[in-house]
Amino acid sequence: VKSRYHQRQYRARKRYAKARRTKKPKRRPKPPRKLRYAPSKKQPKIMKLKLDNEVDNTLKAKNKSLNEALKNRLSLRKHV
């Protein structure tokens, strides 16, 4: 099959010739201005004492392991 528009099978037919415009330099978008009408309601983050944090972590780990054990027990019961 002979293509109607030579060497342009991959591109759609150009209907009207468009005038070439000069390239405009791209402008960086400005970051939006921060409007602060009132002080933010967020409470300041108070750093926990390291020891307290560690205690919390150990408790969390213990709970996790207990939950895992219970899950396994339940799953074993199901299979029996």
From Swiss-Prot:
One of its GO terms (cellular component) is nucleosome. Residues 1-36 have a biased composition (Basic residues). It is found in: Nucleus; Chromosome. GO terms for molecular function: DNA binding. One of its GO terms (biological process) is cell differentiation. It comes from the Eukaryota. Residues 1-44 are annotated as: Disordered. Its main location: nucleus. Keywords: Chromosome, Developmental protein, Differentiation, DNA-binding, Nucleosome core, Nucleus, Spermatogenesis. N-terminal half is highly basic, while C-terminal part is acid. Involved in nuclear basic protein transition: histones are replaced by spermatid specific proteins which are themselves replaced by protamines in late spermatids. This is Spermatid-specific protein S2. It comes from Scyliorhinus canicula. The lineage of its organism: Eukaryota, Metazoa, Chordata, Craniata, Vertebrata.
